[in-house]
């Protein structure tokens, strides 16, 4: 049995969709709960994660609960609700990307017939097929399986085999974006039939281009030929990275000791409701992004001044990642539709991007979510005018945290910060790479046992075995 939850910004819309869906039911074989609008008579449009949680709980007496959402923060509220639910209930829940009205009606009919959760989702996702056919539009199945447009006589293409050991991660992808942006041509990058625009470093990353993958550039326009030549030269140069046949041999790192210090970045308070105009909020966001881009230029220069070219390339890549027109466009759309603050819109957009990275199955690319979180934090600091200063240490210290941003690690003094020990994190994150380059001991993914450590307790990190020892 599958029950449904409808999540909408508008109470009237949510109830209306629910009313339509119940017309499809001939029995109580599918329960429907509504979580729509917020309890504020003056500003009733919005979503509430607690409401979503309670709605799910009210229909959790089924094998699965399918959550249908309209847009924007409805998805974020649903994801937050999953974190609030008891694990045994959360395990039953699936979130559906289908259109709210047609998808809910199709899901209701399917669930009422006794279909399993996968069939219900399939029917919801294909709910627009009848309308497409009536309007003479191509099937969505065709679009999903072949997202690249058909070649025409003017379009040229060139395929290369990627020889970068870690694929097209942030640094080589940023080199690709920068290089192709200089040509007057319409371009697409294609891998296995899926196309993205080379203007967006984030779209390129989500293609998950790995070592030995074939990547094709399709170009059309006055400078198409020049773009293809530059693309080939980039590939031959491994997109600016040194070609390595095998992973580099890590230098042996001796155990490091110090006093435990729990580190947490400053928390930025994000208000959803805005008292400003949309244009004023857009200006605030652009200014905060500009300030963050200046921060990244400073970090790049700091690394270059220390002869750390690989680290400088990381923050140069961050600059490209942040300066992505699609991110600003998505945030501007939220500002238009939800009349929210710039920080709320930006948080929504970058959290969604961070989650997309976390869902990748390539460990190296997956770890880039930490870079996105770093950029979000830095921008929120500027938007909320929050003062942030790193703690100063006078004796050997081991930093303890759930995770730590790359920009934070670069600003640490390795003379006193001897090691970093995380409950989460990733051994292939840029934070880990920077720590190793600076000679700071690094262990991660230690889980809850990390929090048994007392502040000021003496710790020794064994980097080789990825374990810590408490010395009282």
UniProtKB/Swiss-Prot annotation:
Residues 1-135 form the PTS EIIA type-4 domain. NCBIfam families: dha_pts (TIGR02364), PRK11377.1 (NF008478), PTS_HPr_family (TIGR01003). It catalyses: dihydroxyacetone + phosphoenolpyruvate = dihydroxyacetone phosphate + pyruvate. One of its GO terms (molecular function) is protein homodimerization activity. This is PEP-dependent dihydroxyacetone kinase, phosphoryl donor subunit DhaM. InterPro entries: DhaM, DhaM_N, HPr-like, HPr-like_sf, PEP-util_enz_mobile_dom, Phosphohistidine_dom_sf, PTS_EIIA_man-typ, PTS_EIIA_man-typ_sf. The active site is at 9 (tele-phosphohistidine intermediate), 169 (pros-phosphohistidine intermediate), 430 (tele-phosphohistidine intermediate). CDD domains: PTS-HPr_like. One of its GO terms (cellular component) is membrane. Residues 264-472 are annotated as: PTS EI-like, N-terminal part. Unlike the carbohydrate-specific transporters of the PTS, the complex DhaKLM has no transport activity. The gene is dhaM. Keywords: Transferase. Residues 155-242 form the HPr domain.
